[in-house]
Amino acid sequence: MPRKGPAPKRPLVNDPVYGSQLVTQLVNKVLLKGKKSLAERIVYGALENAREKTGTDPVITLKRALDNVKPALEVRSRRVGGATYQVPVEVRPDRSTTLALRWLVSFSRQRREKTMVERLANEILDASNGLGASVKRREDTHKMAEANRAFAHYRW
């Protein structure tokens, strides 16, 4: 624990195109090697692609996808008397959003489509329909928490 206390959270600016902080967070997750304009081009292209396929506002589609991917529970390692237990804990709202965005981007990078724009758009669309690898990751996380429910009394 730092002596000065926790570092203050920096305020996120709203995205200039959609006016959404979620889109800004998504751009920052796609960002690699400081190439922000490339990350913005990828995200905006993916959202436009999603708009063409669904005919609805892409930010609403993104929010629906995130709601389907956000975990409610996760497991944390806790050492008790020489044994390490996987203890299920509830996920804070900001962490669940961060995890959902991280999973969306990482699983879209593993997809087979030709461009990153197509991969991200299809992963967002799949997640908004309750399909895709990122939704499966959430289900696996919940299954792991449920399987280790016996250790919930070690929560801190």
Curated annotation (Swiss-Prot):
UniProt gene name: rpsG
Pfam families tied to this protein: Ribosomal_S7
SUPFAM superfamilies for the chain: Ribosomal protein S7
Listed InterPro entries: Ribosomal_uS7 (IPR000235), Ribosomal_uS7_bac/org-type (IPR005717), Ribosomal_uS7_CS (IPR020606), Ribosomal_uS7_dom (IPR023798), Ribosomal_uS7_dom_sf (IPR036823)
Organism: Mycolicibacterium paratuberculosis (strain ATCC BAA-968 / K-10)
Function summary: One of the primary rRNA binding proteins, it binds directly to 16S rRNA where it nucleates assembly of the head domain of the 30S subunit. Is located at the subunit interface close to the decoding center, probably blocks exit of the E-site tRNA.
Gene3D superfamilies reported in the protein's UniProt record: Ribosomal protein S7 domain
GO molecular function, one term: structural constituent of ribosome
Family according to the record: Belongs to the universal ribosomal protein uS7 family.
PANTHER family in UniProt: RIBOSOMAL PROTEIN S7
Species classification: Bacteria, Bacillati, Actinomycetota, Actinomycetes, Mycobacteriales
GO terms of biological process kind: translation
Protein known as: Small ribosomal subunit protein uS7
Quaternary structure (record): Part of the 30S ribosomal subunit. Contacts proteins S9 and S11.
GO CC aspect terms: small ribosomal subunit
Keywords: Ribonucleoprotein, Ribosomal protein, RNA-binding, rRNA-binding, tRNA-binding
